[in-house]
Amino acid sequence: FAVRNANGTGPYQLVSREQDVKTVLKAFDGYWGKGKYPLGITELVYLTIKSDATRVAALLSGEVDFVQDTPVQDIQRLEAAPGMRVAVGPENRAIFFGMNIGSPELASSDVKGKNPFADKRVRNALVAAIDREAIKRAVMRGQAVPAGMIAPPFVNGYDKALDTPPKADPEAAKKLLAEAGYPNGFSVTLNCPNDRYINDEAICQASVSMFAKIGINVKLSAGPKGPHFNLIQKEPPETDFFLLGWGVPTYDSHYIFSFLHQTRGGKDGTWNATRYSNKDLDAKIVSLTSETDLAKRNATIADIWKTVQSDAIYIPIHNQTLAFAMKADLDIITHPDNQVFMKMFGGKK
């Protein structure tokens, strides 16, 4: 492709740009794909509007025609507004909790001399404590798909059987904690971003209440995504319990395994703040990069998923959904990667 289509021959040309204010693009007559794509939009004006309320107000007032990041609390209102429509679709992003399961002791816990998260019964107790349907209903306003694994359905290696969302069972969770030696629970700090994922801090707040019901006293520490991600990526990581979201641009499970499950070191496991390490699993993950027999490769992927699911390394919550709001005479569809492909738009309905 790149041999015959030089950089700078895309569907739109840059006209002007004011950083964090406005970017203006116009259709490029020399686009190599002209005639192959509708190209109904001849000029694009991107406005940066950080406030959810201001963004929605701009759409309703006619200042803008389209809003990409529609707040879940405003979807119903926009759907009911005259002259408006909302397109909803699945996003390529799983939301989940991670735990420090590899350190001898949790820095933020009142348990000293051992690590509660190192016991799989404790991890399974936390899995059972989460009421995913309640989060979907009350926090996400229905705009989420409860999950049992941290891979969206369109990723190679996805297993519907493994993705069955665990039912909330506080009593079973309490029993698991007691069996693990924590009948009265324990305390730990949960690190959460407040500006990265849809209602991220609200998800954490709801989960803190759910963990409290089984006796785990979780102190919530929420902050901007930059410092939050630094806690996860530092060496060693500086978090015992954290919220994270993960998209899969390759649409293949190897992308998940190599960043989140592989033993951390060098370029491997760079987002694996769980301290999980399984050398046999590492070898299988590495083999995926060279295996040319697709049947064998997919069998290895399935085997890896069974192992990491059994080990309960992460606590899946849900997959995000996307909502694009626009004037009713526009028809712009959602894409799992949350990209707006304006060249695919043929014009007004």
Positions of predicted regions on the chain:
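Short helix-initiation/N-cap motifs at beta->coil->alpha
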Residues: N7, Y46-A57, D69-Q73, D195, ...
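Extracytoplasmic/peripheral linker and loop segments enriched in polar/acidic and small residues
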Residues: K120-A128, K136, I214-H228, F257-A328, ...
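Structural transition elements
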Residues: P11, A128, V145-E179, R196-D200
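Aromatic-rich, solvent-exposed beta-strand/loop patch
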Residues: A2-T54, R77-F96, I101-G102, E171, ...
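Periplasmic-binding protein-like
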Residues: D74, V111-V155, N199-I203, V308-P316
